[in-house]
Amino acid sequence: DDSETWKFVGNLPLTQFYKVAVNNAKPFYPIFGGPQDNGSAGGPSATDEIEGIANKHWYKTLFADGHQSATDPVYNNIVYAETQQGGLYRIDLTSGEKVSIQPQASDGEPHERFNWDAPILVSPHKPSRLYFASYRVWKSENRGDEWIPISGDLTRNENRIELPIMGRKQGWNNAWDVGAMSNYN
C-alpha cells in the first residue's frame, strides 16, 4: 500500500552485539553486552513467561556506543560496561550507580591511547581484580577504584590519521573517520 500502513513487530531479536558476558544470577542468567550504536544492555537468557523473551525484558546499562561488557562472578549486581575509546564504567544494577573507572595517566606521562573496543577482563580467581588495556595493560585490585600499569607501550604509537592511505594522508576534518575507530596502531 505504498507504505501507508506499518506494523511494529516487538519480538524480533535484532541488534548487533560487539561482545557479550553472562553472570551467575538465577533462575535465568542475564546476558550483558554492547549493541552497536545503542548503548549497553542486559536481558535474560530465558524466561518462564509464555510470550518468551520480549523487548520489555531488556534494559540499558550504559549510554553511547556500547562495547564490551564484563560481569563479577560473585556479585551479580556488579557489571562493567564501556563506550568507545576505553570509556569504562562500573555499574551497580541494584542502586543504578554508574562510576567512571577508566585508568588515567599519571602526571608527566603521555595521554592514554585506547582502542575503539578496549579489552577488559575480570579475574575468575579474584573478582575484585580487573585487567584493562590502553596502549598498555592495567590492573586494579579494587574493582577499578585504583589502577596500576603492568606493561609498557604495546603499540607502534602510530597516529593512523597521519599515515598515508593509497598515497594520501587523511585529515582530522574527515568527520566520517575521526572517532569512528581507534586513532592509533
Predicted feature locations:
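Beta-propeller blade termini and top-face loops
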Residues: 1-185
